[in-house]
Amino acid sequence: LFCRLRSSRRAAALTALDKVDTPEARAALRAALVQNVAKTKAPAVLRLVFHDSGTRSVADRDGGFNASVRFELSRPESFGLKRGLGPVTAVFEATRDGPASGLSFADVIAAASAYAVELTGGPEITSKLRFGRVDAQGPDPENRMPAESAASTKSAFRAMGYTTRETICLPGAHTIGGKRFGEPYVFDNAYYRTLLARPWDSAKNSSATTDDLEMGSHVGLTSDKNFATDDESLEFINLYAVDQNLWFRQFTEMYVKMTESEATWRDT
């Protein structure tokens, strides 16, 4: 009897999941994304997915991608996230009625951030996403976001289950937004090309003027600049700087992995 009850519950859960991920649900979600996510908000929307997944701990088997970012907005590292949360909330509200009403907030963050990549010229990722996540009901543990040095950043990403290649693949997303890696609304491999050029480094750019170096000093985060002088990181920076398609493919794989990390699913 117990086994039959468990089987019945699992079948019901799977049926509920099937209703979440249908062609009709995906079409309704797509319409809401197009309506509510503007290109000018794409960098802020994409930033959400990194902050939401950046709390993952493989050792503790907690944190990760679960929409807990909604409850973490007062943290110092979350400054400015409300700008991205607005469009995502609008997409979520627009899908509360109709075939996409079963999507969780985490599902919508994953889809909206993927759409932000596509909207700015990057790879199409949304169709590769799995839906049916369960939302967190409170914040994840604090003090898990990466620090500034290359070594500490790689260590933080290892704690989240990522290799060095994967660690270097992800921050290429800084190519959009205000970090000054190329055009702010163009998703390309300018991040890696800029790291190799090191416009902030007078030794690398001996003919640069003081004004040039001053402008260069405002490019990227300290952690980005530290990658540019880390031998292990440079192996992958060089690869992505010359092969944008390779980076697009591997970023897509990493995005899917990141949005499934430590997620709780409705069919489990």
Residues covered by each model-derived region:
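Catalytic cores of secreted/periplasmic or lumenal enzymes
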Residues: 13-268
